């Protein structure tokens, strides 16, 4: 997605060869117009898949899941990192290690909202090590739901996340694939034509 790549170059900050800060427009201060375009693009990429739910993890994936679910006309669910006192029913859960926070969470989704009848699209802000997305795919599998695919807003293609998901047979669509990055610049893998 060209507009997203341009914003990453313009407003993103490379903190190291593996850390990209995009909080000026994606995951702290949020550009709502760009967010809605991202959701529309995911809806286009996964059109015809009869998706019934969009799933993400709190917090940085929520607005992308909302925009995508809005474009698809279906509900979205976000996995919680900590079990709330209001979450009294049974849950699906999986451990997830956060690269940026260096913490491991036990994410959970209520069994009430995810079932074997669902066709699920997972959406998140980053695909890097793949830990969050693998955790979410495990929850979808535990529910017996059909995983249609994963949509990542930004992919750090030089990290192992894509490989882990591909080994599991997961379809991945990333809107900005970064081949490499340094304070001197960001190199993208060029977009491939969308599947029809």
Swiss-Prot record:
Pfam families for this protein: Pribosyltran
Disulfide bond in keyword set: no
GO CC field: cytoplasm
Enzyme category, top tier: transferase
Positions bound to xanthine: 20, 27, 156
A Gene Ontology molecular function term of the record: xanthine phosphoribosyltransferase activity
Pathway recorded for this protein: Purine metabolism; XMP biosynthesis via salvage pathway; XMP from xanthine: step 1/1
GO biological process: purine ribonucleoside salvage; xanthine metabolic process; XMP salvage
Keywords: Cytoplasm, Glycosyltransferase, Purine salvage, Transferase
Keyword Cytoplasm found: yes
Top-level taxon of the source organism: Bacteria
Similarity comment: Belongs to the purine/pyrimidine phosphoribosyltransferase family. Xpt subfamily.
PANTHER family cross-referenced by the UniProt entry: HYPOXANTHINE/GUANINE PHOSPHORIBOSYLTRANSFERASE (PTHR43864), XANTHINE PHOSPHORIBOSYLTRANSFERASE (PTHR43864:SF1)
Subunit structure comment from the entry: Homodimer.
The protein's role, per its UniProt record: Converts the preformed base xanthine, a product of nucleic acid breakdown, to xanthosine 5'-monophosphate (XMP), so it can be reused for RNA or DNA synthesis.
Protein's UniProt name: Xanthine phosphoribosyltransferase
Primary gene name: xpt
């Amino acid at each position: 997605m060209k507009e997203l790549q341009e914003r990453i170059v313009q407003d993103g900050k490379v903190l190291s060869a593996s850390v990209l800060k995009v909080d000026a427009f994606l995951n702290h201060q949020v550009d709502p117009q760009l967010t809605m375009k991202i959701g529309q693009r995911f809806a286009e990429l996964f059109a015809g898949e009869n998706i019934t739910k969009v799933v993400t993890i709190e917090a940085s994936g929520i607005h992308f899941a909302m925009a995508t679910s809005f474009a698809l006309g279906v509900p979205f669910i976000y996995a919680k990192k900590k079990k709330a006192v209001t979450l009294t029913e049974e849950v699906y859960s999986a451990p997830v290690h956060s690269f940026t926070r260096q913490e491991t969470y036990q994410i959970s989704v209520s069994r009430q909202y995810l079932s074997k009848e669902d066709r699920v699209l997972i959406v998140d802000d980053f695909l890097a090590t793949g830990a969050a997305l693998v955790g979410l795919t495990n929850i979808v599998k535990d529910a017996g739901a059909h995983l249609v695919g994963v949509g990542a807003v930004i992919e750090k293609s030089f990290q192992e996340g894509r490989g882990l998901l591909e080994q599991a047979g997961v379809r991945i669509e990333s809107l900005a694939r970064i081949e490499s990055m340094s304070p001197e610049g960001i190199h993208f893998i060029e977009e491939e034509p969308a599947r029809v």
